[in-house]
Amino acid sequence: MPTSTQMKSKKNLHGILGVALLVCSEILMLKGIEPFASWFYYCAWWSYILIVDSLIYTIKKNSLIMNRGGEFLLMLFWSVFIWTFFEAVNLVLKNWYYVNVVAYRFIRWPGYAFAYATVLPGVFETTELLESLGVFKKSRVKPLSVNRYWIVGLLTLGIVSLGGVLLYPTYCFPLTWGFLIFLLEPINYLKGGTSILREWERGTLRKFYLLLLAGFICGALWEFWNFWAVTKWIYTVPFFEELKLFEMPILGFLGFPPFTVECYVFYNFISLFRYQRGWEEDTYGPNQGKRVKFPFAVGTFIAVSLFCLLTFSAMDEKTVNSYWPDVGELQMMRPEVLEYFASRGITTPHALLATIGSAQGKKELAQKCAISESEITRWVHLAQLSLVKGMGTRNAYVLTVIGVESFSDLAAQDPALLYDKLVTLAKEQLRPKGTAPPREAIVRLWVREARKKASNHQKVP
């Protein structure tokens, strides 16, 4: 245990770094400067983790990064695994998808890991901050007498919930954010690990309440920061596609609190295989001298890494809907025009619209490149189309094959019929190589968003 003098000697500067990174990335994102516009989510969450950890250290002179750095680094690894596990579940659920993802795999896959590594530190740091501030400090409940009926009941509920998620995902998808609690918490309790049930036996559910509140806070931040990023996720949750806050259906926010409890229980389960060493101040110290056997550690690392890589590959095929947009993929310009734009750094629909979106911009380009203004107007419409719900330039090009060349054209489509046409194109191999037709739920979102844009466009005098 470090002395008070040693603790005071530590430089608590990472919070300042976090604030600087958050402010700078926010400004650069709003200006549309890459890579901050696309990767704003990454910058925001790593900033948040640094800031919160610094606050915790300021309050109690003990924090995850400053005093439990080894556990923090290990947590990053398990955070990637745990969220990748839910990505694997989403291959069945189809509740969300990603847009405007970087096209190069050697960047994209590390990007997945870099983003998913923030999940556990984000929720656990928030939980510890709330605890440090004394939230729910005096909360007490009637002690629970845990018996075999509780254990069997929870395990049964977990098995039934998992079965429902896998077999009837359309109706049972909410159980995704709870089934691991029911499955793993009884095991944690029986094996003597850190357990919410054991705390309940002692007449307190403070940790449970803190986790729920931390989940709500982090959920709000997840959705808020995701909303502004170019590279982002979008939800296609059954029955709740229309009423949303940011990109999340309103009722979906109820899933974040139990998800945080699920992460806590999952991490405690993993800790059973590490002599019950945990991330919290009171569970980090015991058994520090004991180490997991090297073959077991290596085997675990290989198995987890292989699982993540296989899931990343499946996500590329099933969950990623669009890549970073490139105007060249719209196949609407002559090579010399593309070269002209490339020489000026105009390679994305956003940059194209900023250049030729106005009447003056169209006129100047028409004069320089000997192109009719009507042709330039078509480019503008296609660029606007590619931005509808992060559809991307590849999907926009496919829509042009079936006669949809603007968001007004898209707004006039019947979603079900349009989806059938896109499936037919895929069967006839008329889609760009390496792309799959979007799910019907995604097509519905496109059409709904296009109708909003068309309606707003008509209201403009």
Predicted regions, residues:
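C-terminal extensions
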Residues: 317-461
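Aromatic-rich, lipid-facing transmembrane alpha helices and their immediate juxtamembrane interface loops
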Residues: 2-328, 332, 458-461
